[in-house]
């Protein structure tokens, strides 16, 4: 996976997702996407301020607080936050950065792709997964 990967390829090569802006509110889009991705076999780690759990997964306050490989950083935040999140994703060793609908940043794209990360923006992980019939086949799922 690299800067030229398609959204479907990113999802296929992803197992662990750090979801920035995950919400414990079932009415929020991030909650529904997290629930869907977990049901499809992805491990989704909610990243947000505070403590507790979302869908049984403990909340982590930053990417730096995750002590396992991060395949994708999935972002439910405003576009203005994307460049700093891209820098954090690079520093955390993430393989891809995905900005959800409404989040668009050429600066974040440049930061991510120049560091070799795959990148998608202004598109929903749940929608791509459903439309492309892809699923995780990353390293943790291979024999």
Predicted feature locations:
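Mid-chain, well-packed structural core segment of small domains
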Residues: 63-104
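A charged, well-structured terminal subsegment
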Residues: 128-143
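Active-site regions of enzymes building and remodeling cell-envelope glycoconjugates
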Residues: 56-63, 118
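A short helix->loop->beta-strand "cap" motif at the edges of active sites that frequently abuts
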Residues: 40-42, 92-96, 115-117
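Conserved beta-strand elements of the Class I
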Residues: 17-18
């Amino acid at each position: 996976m690299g800067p030229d990967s398609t959204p479907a390829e990113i999802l296929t090569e992803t197992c662990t997702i750090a979801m920035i802006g995950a919400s414990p509110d079932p009415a929020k889009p991030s909650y529904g996407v997290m629930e869907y991705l977990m049901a499809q076999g992805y491990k989704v780690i909610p990243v947000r301020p505070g403590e507790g759990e979302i869908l049984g997964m403990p909340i982590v306050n930053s990417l730096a607080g995750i002590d396992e490989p991060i395949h994708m950083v999935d972002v439910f935040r405003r576009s203005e936050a994307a460049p700093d999140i891209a820098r954090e994703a690079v520093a955390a060793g993430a393989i891809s950065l995905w900005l959800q609908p409404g989040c668009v940043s050429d600066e974040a794209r440049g930061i991510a792709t120049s560091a070799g990360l795959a990148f998608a923006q202004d598109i929903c992980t749940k929608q791509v997964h459903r439309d492309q019939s892809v699923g995780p086949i990353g390293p943790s799922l291979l024999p």
